[in-house]
């Protein structure tokens, strides 16, 4: 029996500037957070270190990508601030 992969939508909070957040998608959450904290991701390197604020697991890749796209909109960011 093979295990079904998970797809993650995550929100990071900068520990150096708590007003900074980053929303992303990955299949390997631990490794992706490590990449952000190592400075391997140009968009987030300036505001290291990061802490994982929220992670949501999906079994459906497309649903995960839909949520990521939504959370990157103005109304999605407002939703995340209030609910996540």
Regions found by a protein language model. Give the residues of each.
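GIY-YIG nuclease catalytic motif and its immediate N-terminal context
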Residues: 1-43, 48, 55, 62-77, ...
């Amino acid at each position: 029996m093979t295990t079904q992969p998970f797809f993650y939508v995550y929100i990071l909070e900068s520990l150096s500037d708590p007003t900074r957040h980053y929303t992303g998608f990955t299949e390997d959450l631990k490794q992706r957070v490590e990449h952000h904290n190592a400075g391997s991701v140009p968009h987030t390197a300036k505001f290291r270190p990061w802490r994982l604020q929220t992670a949501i697991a999906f079994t459906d890749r497309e649903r995960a990508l839909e949520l990521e796209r939504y959370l990157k909109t103005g109304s999605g960011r407002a939703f995340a601030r209030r609910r996540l």
